[in-house]
């Protein structure tokens, strides 16, 4: 039986995804979360885990170095990679929002600029809204942009809204709810269909059970 390679995003999603896999009966070592290795083999399950930046997970899966992966819907929409999205894991729920300073008024914004680490997603959203904006790509600390005059608004992930409040920003528009998804390489799905189908079925039972 060939090894199944799983790409996992480092950070909050990783911890929740590992918990989900354990609930689904996968025997993952207790020190798994504390490991600083980027590649972790689990011989008991004949699985290999690749720990990557969230934005890179779909790339690893698309190119076949990982058979399956866990990725946020925000990353999927931004990256638009050639992968199958097979299951909504319903973990790490948050939402994408447009935010800005409390006194922001769209009608007075003659040269609208929006900062985001999701330039493609933001561009599509504002186009659908019939609004022409200049998108400025940032890789972090997006909330800084309106405070220093780089942009009037931002598009970013919101979990509790605490970061916005602490930086004096307010939510202007809620764009969409985001959860993490199980994604699969199309070739792997054909070559390792039994193992992948088994994983999907086991995870589905946990997801539906938790949601009951």
Curated annotation (Swiss-Prot):
Reaction(s) the record says it catalyses: 1-(5-phospho-beta-D-ribosyl)-ATP + diphosphate = 5-phospho-alpha-D-ribose 1-diphosphate + ATP
EC supergroup of this enzyme: transferase
UniProt keyword terms in alphabetical order: Amino-acid biosynthesis, ATP-binding, Cytoplasm, Glycosyltransferase, Histidine biosynthesis, Nucleotide-binding, Transferase
This protein's pathway: Amino-acid biosynthesis; L-histidine biosynthesis; L-histidine from 5-phospho-alpha-D-ribose 1-diphosphate: step 1/9
EC number: 2.4.2.17
One record GO biological process: L-histidine biosynthetic process
Entry's family note: Belongs to the ATP phosphoribosyltransferase family. Short subfamily.
Subunit text: Heteromultimer composed of HisG and HisZ subunits.
Function in brief: Catalyzes the condensation of ATP and 5-phosphoribose 1-diphosphate to form N'-(5'-phosphoribosyl)-ATP (PR-ATP). Has a crucial role in the pathway because the rate of histidine biosynthesis seems to be controlled primarily by regulation of HisG enzymatic activity.
UniProt-listed HAMAP family: HisG_Short (MF_01018)
Protein name: ATP phosphoribosyltransferase
